[in-house]
A protein has these predicted regions:
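Hydrophobic alpha-helical transmembrane segments of multi-pass integral membrane proteins
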Residues: 1-225
Length: 225
């Protein structure tokens, strides 16, 4: 992200980054221990809850750090990608919380299914999906060795807004799955999310028209998208 924003953070100021990395990994270990052993000893759910809380908090802290860096950096065409990263970082705490809820011992099956679907929507479509799509905004033309097409940044920001809205609607619809119309709302949320993806796809196709991918890496990325 520093390269994208063209900023240089001195080594003496990297204490926060190191703390986040070590604490995040510790939280992941605690979370895994809780998930593995709480079935035999339900009281160990506290480890699952603590681990999920730490993971969510560290990633959110990373999002705040990125937000501060954006405010300090000069305007850049790569700024759109950082916006995607910030949005994704702020989604993970909610995904982690929903994941912790699904692991609660004795949770009723219907609630478990609803929380699980919401957890998957936030983490897969939100945290992972938004991060990957944001990377492609700038990485795709780089792989093709060409420039970003006109209006790509503006379109990508609107696509991000739609993707966030789609994730939010889908997750809330899953949580309140017993409410009449929730399934329709969840489908509508997915549709909105897909519209955001299609907007990014249009950017990718327009970029590809300036220079067609002739090597395996860009072809595989395009096929994967």
């Amino acid at each position: 992200t520093e390269a994208l924003m063209k900023i240089k953070i001195p080594d003496e100021a990297r204490g926060g980054q190191v703390t986040r990395i070590f604490t995040l990994n510790a939280g992941i270990v605690v979370l895994m221990l809780g998930m593995v052993f709480q079935e035999q000893l339900p009281t160990l759910y506290i480890l699952t809850l603590a681990g999920a809380s730490v993971v969510g908090a560290m990633v959110a802290w990373h999002g705040v750090a990125l937000l501060k860096q954006v405010k300090q950096a000069l305007p850049s065409r790569f700024g759109a990608t950082i916006r995607f990263y910030i949005a994704a970082a702020f989604m993970l705490p909610f995904g982690a919380a929903l994941g912790a809820m699904t692991a609660f011992p004795g949770l009723e099956k219907t609630l478990h299914a609803q929380f699980l679907l919401a957890h998957e929507a936030v983490n897969v479509l939100g945290f992972v999906g938004v991060t990957v799509v944001g990377t492609l905004i700038t990485f795709w033309p780089t792989m093709l060795r060409t420039k970003m097409v006109e209006n790509a940044l503006g379109i990508s920001v609107r696509a991000l807004q739609l993707m966030i809205a789609g994730v939010l609607v889908t997750a809330l619809s899953a949580i309140f799955g017993g409410v009449p119309g929730a399934r329709f709302a969840a489908g509508a949320g997915l549709l909105v999310y897909c519209v955001g993806l299609l907007m990014v796809a249009v950017i990718m196709v327009r970029t590809m028209r300036t220079k067609r991918p002739g090597e395996f890496p860009p072809m595989s990325v395009g096929a994967g998208f």
